Amino acid sequence: MNKLREQTLALASILQTTTLIDQLASTGTCDANSNQASLKSIITSSTKLEEVFNQKQDLLVGIDALKVVLSNKTKCIQHIIFYALALINLEKKLMKNQTLLNQITLEIDLIRNQDFFEISHINSIARLAQLYKSTLGGLNPKIMINGQQIYLSNKHTSNHIRALLLAGIRAVSLWKSQGGKTWHLLLNKKKILNLINTLEGLN
């Protein structure tokens, strides 16, 4: 898999998590298949995109979101872009805090090895949410989620959002491991759009 393809899929994985978060905050539900794939990425240790997201449908939501962003139709997904930029900033802070990084790595290793529940099970989501809250949740500025209060005040939904924020950090890490940088979007916009169209044609 070439570098641009890897970077594009990794960027799509970031936007997928933020899209799912926006769906949860706005409607209380989100795309089930993409949710499973994004949460599972947290406990998949590989840095190869085709191993983390190994089915074509795993990143459909993210690829759709990336296409909208690159088509300059950003007004309708401002929250999604804001969350993505906030996650990139948060991941940068995490990389400078070895104590938090070790804590997160250790807990994820435990979750991966115990494997009591499916990663999308309510208990797994609660555990991932607690991990986010006790580590990344303490860093400033905090990521403020916009949505309907009836959903944001629901414990399971708020846990689910935190779990997906953790998946978003994983996605940013994958993107950076492939050499991803925000200015690449400006330089490679046309190439990325062509690649997305090719990927969509394969589905």
Curated annotation (Swiss-Prot):
Cell membrane among keywords: yes
Annotated compartments: Cytoplasm; Cell inner membrane
Gene Ontology CC terms: cytoplasm; plasma membrane
Membrane topology label: Peripheral membrane protein
InterPro entries xref list: HflD (IPR007451), HflD-like_sf (IPR035932)
Highest taxon of the lineage: Bacteria
UniProtKB keywords: Cell inner membrane, Cell membrane, Cytoplasm, Membrane
Entries under HAMAP family matching the protein: HflD_protein (MF_00695)
NCBIfam families referenced in this protein's UniProt entry, alphabetically: PRK00218.1-2 (NF001246)
Protein name (record): High frequency lysogenization protein HflD homolog
Gene label: hflD
